[in-house]
Amino acid sequence: MPQTYAGQKRIRKFYGKIREVLEMPNLIEVQKSSYDLFLKSGDQLEPMDGEGIKGVFQSVFPIKDFNETAILEFVKYELETPKFDVEECQQRDLTYAAPLKVTLRLIVFDIDEDTGAKSVKDIKEQDVFMGDMPLMTPNGTFVVNGTERVIVSQMHRSPGVFFDHDKGKTHSSGKLLFACRIIPYRGSWLDFEFDAKDIVFSRIDRRRKLPVTTLLYALGLDQEGIMDAYYDTVTFKMVKNKGWSTKFFPERVRGTRPTTDLVDAKTGEVIAEAGKKVTPRAVKKWIDEGSIENLLVPFDGIVGRFAAKDIINEETGAIYVEAGDELTWELDKAGEVSGGTLKELIDAGITEIPVLDIDNVNVGPYMRNTLAVDKNLNRESALMDIYRVMRPGEPPTVEAASNLFDQLFFDSERYDLSAVGRVKMNMRLDLDAEDTMRTLRKEDIISCIKALVELRDGRGDIDDIDHLGNRRVRSVGELMENQYRVGLLRMERAIKERMSSVEIDTVMPQDLINAKPAAAAVREFFGSSQLSQFMDQTNPLSEVTHKRRLSALGPGGLTRERAGFEVRDVHPTHYGRMCPIETPEGPNIGLINSLATYARVNKYGFIETPYRRVNDAVVSDDVVYMSATEEMRHTVAQANANLDDDGKFVNDMVNTRMSGEYTLNPREAIDLIDVSPKQLVSVAASLIPFLENDDANRALMGSNMQRQAVPLLQADAPFVGTGIESVVAKDSGAAIMAKRGGVIDQVDAQRIVIRATEDLELGDAGVDIYRLRKFQRSNQNTCINQRPLVKVGDKIGKGEVIADGPSTDIGELALGKNVIVAFMPWNGYNYEDSILISERISRDDVFTSIHIEEFEVAARDTKLGPEEITRDIPNVGEEALRNLDEAGIVYIGAEVEPGDILVGKITPKGESPMTPEEKLLRAIFGEKASDVRDTSLRVKPGDYGTIVEVRVFNRHGVEKDERALQIEREEVERLARDRDDELVILERNIYARLRGMIMGKTAVKGPKGVKPNTVIDEDLLDGQLSRGQWWQLALEDEKDAAHIEALNQQFDTQKRALDHRFEDKVEKVRRGDDLPPGVMKMVKVFIAVKRKLQPGDKMAGRHGNKGVISKVVPMEDMPFLADGTPVDFVLNPLGVPSRMNVGQILETHMGWAARGMGLQIDEALDEYRRSGDMTPVRDALKIAYGDDVYDDAFADRDEESLLEAAGNVTKGVPIATPVFDGAKEADVNDALIRAGFSTSGQSKLFDGRTGEQFAREVTVGVKYLLKLHHLVDDKIHARSTGPYSLVTQQPLGGKAQFGGQRFGEMEVWALEAYGAAYTLQEMLTVKSDDVAGRTKVYESIVKGEDNFEAGVPESFNVLVKEVRGLGLNMELLDAEDDEGGIAAE
């Protein structure tokens, strides 16, 4: 049981039966470890070469100039401390980053003009500032320009070699055309493919195809070399007057019908007749006997075969046949041999002919045919061909062509397979190259083509590109590394040019480097990359899920339009690696996934999942992590397989997975078993109780909607949970955990001070101050607020929860509320998933949430003079200024409504020409108040609430107003309070240690009044001396004296460090702010609004059951139970059967039982308060939790702690039912019986309006419901007049633009159908884009008249202009002007 401090306060009854061997890894580990590896900030050890940011520098440096007279080398790098901490960055809209210093070495050479020998002339080293490097916050996010962002990990195709075919789509015959592709991490793609005629082609970067032999020629092979690489050679020896003798391969004729008799060359005996099938038995006999070595083939049996080597006349050097040529012979009419290459060979007396071993059954002639098609015959012409394809239009030279070809695949700067790519290639092609070999080799290309030809011959399998062994994850660190490399390469070009143009002897490295490109690349990545996303901060779960997301989109990935079904589909290898449930609905389905709970990413970027080892059908606790490729070789049992107490499989045959198939296997064959049933789903899905009883589509919606739950005013952990709630609350960073054990020294709403007692290091003050976040705005405008859970004097262990955050309750995730629901229709108000709620929900603020909006206003310096933030605004009455202070900024705590002024601001207007009277007055009175207009920040329509925070930012050197000074004073006071508290605890600790050191020792001398050689005791220390005088006691023992001196010095050092830190922070507060150019002053105002639940708000359960509130019914009208309790929600029972999410019904029953047991405990506590007897409380706890849990968690507790634990569960006893291993139907029935209910889970309900009982019993229970972030207040919107579109002059659309309602085509038809001509005319003219008409209407409304006329809509004028743009002049004629009667005709 969880015996942490928070865990003791509320005990969950756990229904899981499977023992958890492995703790769930930290949920945001993916992000943190990846970026740590990139920056190597986790450990200050010397980073390994070739990895992270150091690897990037090493891949770009050293940089040489064009003449190689100077060289710029990379020595080391270091990250300095960031200027502002995370919180300061968020407040000031800055990026949380650390300055990157790089040490570079410039070596200048002297070159001897005669010999060309180099000698070092000068070496200079210097630290160069390379811009700021964004740092990750402890929660795995980045703060960029003041907002929290998350870099989503990307799934992409792993580098390596892939074999595939076109599934028969290319050719009409449906023939499979095989292809092979070598994908590097960066560099050119190389493809090999068959065409319909079985010729092998190659393509570079998907350009025009060339015969593959051209590529092989370019690699330096000749015809003979190519034939040698791809075919075995068979030798035919001439047997006088009989034919040819050749080696016999019995295996090859198994199951075939030979076209000619097979004749043993030695005996001349026919061993198999033509046309008869060769049986396997005969083949086995031939192999076992081994007597038949050679076959006799008739003279024409060799015709049509291909020569394996050039056959040359030794004397003259003339070539009879080249390698790959067909052996032919021609017959005359009489059937006599008259010519052909074969006749030439026989005539020349050649008796042995080496032939390619092509039999068109096991080995096809594809490479030989390709050779025949290829026009190139040597390396030069092949290189020229490749050059023409890659650089069309440029005249090729052999040198240029050779350089280009080398750069394409063999130059480590242009081509990188990456370690992953090399490992994958080695595995696929059975090679053994080192994984440091990052470019291609000749052998790699030859092997790829060989494997492709084997596929065509019917040996081997194609790869499945959706297999997770062929897809890998690029996390933050790697994405950042690639981006930084791009920046450095841009910089490299500039450096090279500068090295050539400056006087190299006099410059320092600093002068050569312009770090802007590198810094810009980083900024661009964090600001505008598709994978850098605004963090979803609605609640802690949405944060965690966002950080664990895997996207197949983004640069170098797929696009929504191009992705087919296969990529999006669930693949067997997703098991335990990617969640099969959680993915968005809509166009991104299957492209954006979530990491499974136990999964982790290995160093190669493949996702691994843990398994327990199984030896001889016994499960051990030894855990191994496996990637999808490694897992294919194993037989894996499921976590819920039946085991006995010793961990042995009970059943002889067990359900297992093996290489992607689900089969029954004997228990001895099993070598792995899942660690936990929840390892196959993601965090969000594992929060759904009874997930195993829900349909997958609804579970998907449930997972997605939990992420949209708004944090409520009062969090309430679910009665029916899954046991993983506390993990999410901790790992998300929403709840605060103690960094080390200690005792609570002070607690208030703003901070917690802990006096540490564990992990104390020498020179450590032993004080931990935790600042709580109070009513801060999240990215989604929800409210982040933390509340302490501890009291002064509590003892706390490391990692225990000391404060709750948004949507957490005693250290557990609490996204919604437990409410009493009834499944029944109620006057049609729950038609189509509508929800009926009781007025109690609104009255007691059950589903009330706080939302915080941020408004900002900037006073700029304009051409006409500076804008001013002031209370003195022209033409504004005192009533409108009631909430402003003397500086013109709204008070904290003011209640504001639409149109209220938040910050008063005036802007100078352009001078208007003056009248003579004005000139006179001006001459008399001097400078008149120049014209200003009111540009104050006002509350937008539809917004209202309370001001919770105001921040004022001033430019350096601009005088601060009263409000800014007040805010500054408060901030400095807060910092001083922190410093003082830390100092008090530091002094207490130090003096306690000092006291321990000197107590009972002899003092040689001391302050006034202490006699020499006094023994130090309590009276002396506490009575006579002040604490400060203790240091003046000189001890007899020199060793002790030295210890005390060291302690004193340590005390001074720590005090100085404290003061220095305080002064540094105060200086930051007092210093002006960096504001955008032209801005003198900026004010931010935060408005908080409480939103109650109201009709139109969207609610949901955890099982994908969602609906909109239709009506709030008075409590007395709601259906009520026999004891008079009215239900809170009425849901439609028809929403369950067709949706097949039965989990919600089980949850309802289980929740009902939990509530019933809670009420029993409540009654027992009442009894205790009356009688003082603990027995009924203990009995009630025993009934609720069962004897086992009671003995484990409650039996040994003292009275006070037991009462607290019991008091926390009076509303309902919380239970945990883990996914796929939770409570079964029998458990639910048992719980209902213990709570004193019937096992049907149904209750008698009475109609609140009539008081009569309903016709039959109704399912009533407690369900956990969430209020989603789709609030009617944010959506509803009305407009009278507002902004218009420039061209069409029609009102804009949407709430954000304060737009109008669209009156579309269909609506026009509706009015036409009703014959409402005038209404229609009004809609199309004055209410839309008849500019003159709408102005007149406005005027007449103001005057109180009701006559107007419609004119010509502006869109008609736009149409006329369009037509004129096509060269047709179109004019409108008035009826009066129409003299010729054109209109009448």
Swiss-Prot record:
Q: Name one GO biological process term.
A: DNA-templated transcription
| Enzyme class, broadest EC rank | transferase
Q: Output the Gene Ontology cellular-component terms.
A: DNA-directed RNA polymerase complex
InterPro entries, from UniProt? DNA-dir_RNA_pol_bsu_ext_1_sf, DNA-dir_RNA_pol_bsu_external_1, DNA-dir_RNA_pol_su2, DNA-dir_RNAP_su2_dom, DNA-dir_RNAP_su2_hyb_sf, RNA_pol_bsu_bac, RNA_pol_bsu_CS, RNA_pol_bsu_protrusion
The coiled-coil regions, if any, are none
- Give me the reactions it catalyses: RNA(n) + a ribonucleoside 5'-triphosphate = RNA(n+1) + diphosphate
For this UniProt record, give its keywords in alphabetical order, as a comma-separated list: DNA-directed RNA polymerase, Nucleotidyltransferase, Transcription, Transferase
Recall the GO molecular function terms of this protein's record. Answer: DNA binding; DNA-directed RNA polymerase activity; ribonucleoside binding
Q: What EC number(s) does the entry state?
A: 2.7.7.6
Q: Which PANTHER family match?
A: DNA-DIRECTED RNA POLYMERASE I SUBUNIT 2
Tell me the function of this protein. DNA-dependent RNA polymerase catalyzes the transcription of DNA into RNA using the four ribonucleoside triphosphates as substrates.
Q: How does it assemble?
A: The RNAP catalytic core consists of 2 alpha, 1 beta, 1 beta' and 1 omega subunit. When a sigma factor is associated with the core the holoenzyme is formed, which can initiate transcription.
The UniProt entry's sequence similarity note says: Belongs to the RNA polymerase beta chain family.
Q: What is this protein called?
A: DNA-directed RNA polymerase subunit beta
The organism is Jannaschia sp. (strain CCS1)
